[in-house]
Amino acid sequence: MATLRASVERVASAYRMRLKQMTDLQQKVKAFQFSNSYYNQLGLLYHDVIPHSPLIAEAVRRLPREETEARDFRIARAFQLSASKTVLPKEQWTAIEDDIPYLDPYIEVAKKEWKEKAEWDHFVNPETYP
C-alpha cells in the first residue's frame, strides 16, 4: 500500500506540474471548464463523479480506508447539497490544483492484473494436452 500511496503523490505532483506547464490559453480554457462544472461547487473531485464500471469499482475497493472515508464523505455531502439545491460557499469549492486524479494508480494496477489474468486464462498446460 505504501508504494500505491507514493504513486498517488507522484500523480498529484505530475498533475500540478502539467497545470503549470500549460500555455496561457490552455490554462484559461481549463479554468473556464472547471469553474463551469458543477462537481467542484459541491466539493467533489473528478474521480468522485467518474461513471462506475467494474474497473472503477475495483480501484475504489483498493483505496486505503482514510481515502475511502474521505470519498464517501464528499459524496454524501454533495448528495445532501444537491437535494437541498444549494452549493458550498465559494471558499470551500474544490480548487483546480486540488482536483488530483487520485484513482489513477489503482486503476492502472487493476488493469495490469486483469490483463495478466486474461493472459493466464488462455494458458494451456503442456502436461494436460501433450
From Swiss-Prot:
The keyword Mitochondrion applies. It is a peripheral membrane protein. Component of the ubiquinol-cytochrome c oxidoreductase (cytochrome b-c1 complex, complex III, CIII), a multisubunit enzyme composed of 3 respiratory subunits cytochrome b, cytochrome c1 and Rieske protein, 2 core protein subunits, and additional low-molecular weight protein subunits. The complex exists as an obligatory dimer and forms supercomplexes (SCs) in the inner mitochondrial membrane with cytochrome c oxidase (complex IV, CIV). Pfam families: UCR_14kD. Belongs to the UQCRB/QCR7 family. GO terms for biological process: mitochondrial electron transport, ubiquinol to cytochrome c. This is Cytochrome b-c1 complex subunit 7. The gene is UBCRBP. One of its GO terms (cellular component) is mitochondrial inner membrane. Component of the ubiquinol-cytochrome c oxidoreductase, a multisubunit transmembrane complex that is part of the mitochondrial electron transport chain which drives oxidative phosphorylation. It is found in: Mitochondrion inner membrane. The keyword Transport applies. Keywords: Electron transport, Membrane, Mitochondrion, Mitochondrion inner membrane, Respiratory chain, Transport.
